[in-house]
Regions:
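Conserved PLP-enzyme active-site core in the AAT-like
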Residues: 1-161, 168
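Conserved small-domain helix->loop->beta segment predominantly found in fold-type I
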Residues: 121-124, 130, 139, 151-207
């Protein structure tokens, strides 16, 4: 099961715990894209996610200088007991016949990524680009905090503008369920990505 902590583009909030419970009841891992929220706003593994991914190019890097991504494996999902992931359980002929679940247990998924996908595709970043991302991480919490503060001011302005029909951001959602999920998962703010709809048609927007 693959979801986003904040849906693109309207920043819809998902109930991570509920979806995690449903996935685990069917012996399926929950994978979450946490790019919009970042670890500063929400840490999905604490709510039951098994794997978290980020586009590091966005908030982690912070300056649009580097392309990269992050995969975080919680190490909590039992891939062998699931019975749905033969490529992790059965011997891999391209890697000396190793069974990743037998060799490293719950770390089978991330180990296969390193041993097979990295080997086959070369999906890794250079030392310099890694350095740039690490520099970005040093200021991540402060930057995201400011992003949220600035976004809330713009959202408030647009939400009260007579020519704006609707603003899509969890802080101003009129949906009771979204309001509850926002309070539960985002005590530090609902991110800085939002969309809005203007009143009238395309021509009126141009006018």
């Amino acid at each position: 099961v693959f979801i986003e902590t904040l849906g693109n583009p309207n920043s819809d909030v998902v109930d991570i715990e509920k979806i995690a419970n449903i996935a685990h009841a069917h012996k399926i891992p929950l994978v979450i894209d946490n790019t919009f929220a970042t670890p500063y706003l929400v840490r999905p593994i604490e709510y039951g996610a098994d794997i978290v991914v980020h586009s590091a190019t966005k908030f982690i890097g912070g300056h649009g200088t580097t392309i990269g991504g992050v995969i975080v494996d919680s190490g909590k999902f039992d891939w062998e007991a699931s019975g749905k992931f033969a490529s992790l359980v059965e011997p891999n002929p391209s890697y000396h016949g190793v069974s990743f679940t037998k060799a490293v247990g719950p770390a089978a998924f991330v180990t296969k990524i390193r041993a097979i996908l990295l080997r086959d595709t070369g999906a890794t970043i250079s030392p310099f680009h890694a350095f740039i991302f690490l520099q970005g991480l040093e200021t991540l919490s402060l930057r995201v905090e400011r992003h949220v503060q600035n976004a809330l001011k713009v959202v408030e302005y647009l939400n009260n503008h007579p020519q704006v029909e609707n603003v899509n951001h969890p802080s101003v959602s009129k949906d009771p369920e979204q309001q509850a999920l926002y309070k539960k998962y985002f005590p530090n703010g609902g991110g800085s990505i939002f969309t809005f709809e203007i009143k009238g048609d395309a021509q009126k927007a141009k006018d």
